[in-house]
């Protein structure tokens, strides 16, 4: 359980950046489920 918490956090961080990069690059379609 101790090593699962940080792993899930890393995935969340990566997904946030991944969704942010393409969303802003496309022209901000208005898809911000993380915000």
From Swiss-Prot:
InterPro entries with a match to the protein in the record: PQQ_synth_PqqA
Keyword Cytoplasm: no
Pfam families linked: PqqA
Keywords from the UniProt entry: PQQ biosynthesis
Positions bearing the Pyrroloquinoline quinone (Glu-Tyr) cross-link: 16-20
Annotated family: Belongs to the PqqA family.
Function: Required for coenzyme pyrroloquinoline quinone (PQQ) biosynthesis. PQQ is probably formed by cross-linking a specific glutamate to a specific tyrosine residue and excising these residues from the peptide.
Descriptive protein name: Coenzyme PQQ synthesis protein A
Gene: pqqA
């Amino acid at each position: 359980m101790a090593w699962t918490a940080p792993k899930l956090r890393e995935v969340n961080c990566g997904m946030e950046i991944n969704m942010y990069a393409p969303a802003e690059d496309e022209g901000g379609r208005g898809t911000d489920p993380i915000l």
